[in-house]
Amino acid sequence: MAGHSQFKNIMHKKGKQDAIRSKLFSKLAREITVAAKLGLPDPNMNARLRAAVIAARVENMPKDNIERAIKKASGADAENYDEVRYEGYGPGGVAVIVEALTDNRNRTAGEIRSYFTKVGGALAETGAVSFMFDHIGRIEFPAKVGSEEAMLEAAIEAGAEDVLSGEEGHEVLTSLEMLRDVALALEAKFGEPTRASLIWKPQNTISLDDETGEKVLRLIGLLEDNDDVQNVYANYEVSEAVLAKLEA
């Protein structure tokens, strides 16, 4: 298991669930509001908003919170958020991409830069590391919706590029352009996905020693904890020993 997914598993196993959930709801609400403001306020007519609402439902975000976030987009006092991508190098030369929604670019850039500096990394220019990743679509379904063979057949027929199936579920990968069409086709067959989004998938990963691995995970923890940061992607792998230490 590589990079970001390792860190996510650690966070879910730690005992700070209430604080994590509160911060998560805030980030989900921000994405819903931005998506609704950029397009129509109807999830059925706005692919990005639909994906944001699905992500919120998966995390058991209350329906009232979701509706309030959508309505906020059309309010006179609606905040304006800029979509910003930061790129940099973490310990061990790990490439890191950070996606944020911010109402103050200078504040967010300063905070992101400080996190990289704390662990001996460096914030770089946009484009410095993104060439090491593929910007693609990813659709996720629980394992129970169908067999690996059924998902693979349906996904390829719908125009997907790859399918990864396992005990945790099915992960369907698509081109940027085909994400919406494939998601709709698979939803018609298997029901609503648990997530449908654009991601940065590393082309290759770096295996880190334990000390460097801990520093990289610390960096990702700092980034994830920032209110403006929506997603973090990195091209690393760490040992089970490091994961066990952090989960303790």
From Swiss-Prot:
Gene3D superfamilies: 1.10.10.200, 3.30.70.980. It comes from the Bacteria. Transmembrane segments: none annotated. Pfam families: TACO1_YebC_N (PF20772), Transcrip_reg (PF01709). Coiled coil: none annotated. PANTHER family: TRANSCRIPTIONAL REGULATORY PROTEIN YEBC-RELATED, TRANSLATIONAL ACTIVATOR OF CYTOCHROME C OXIDASE 1. This is Probable transcriptional regulatory protein Msil_2305. It comes from Methylocella silvestris (strain DSM 15510 / CIP 108128 / LMG 27833 / NCIMB 13906 / BL2).
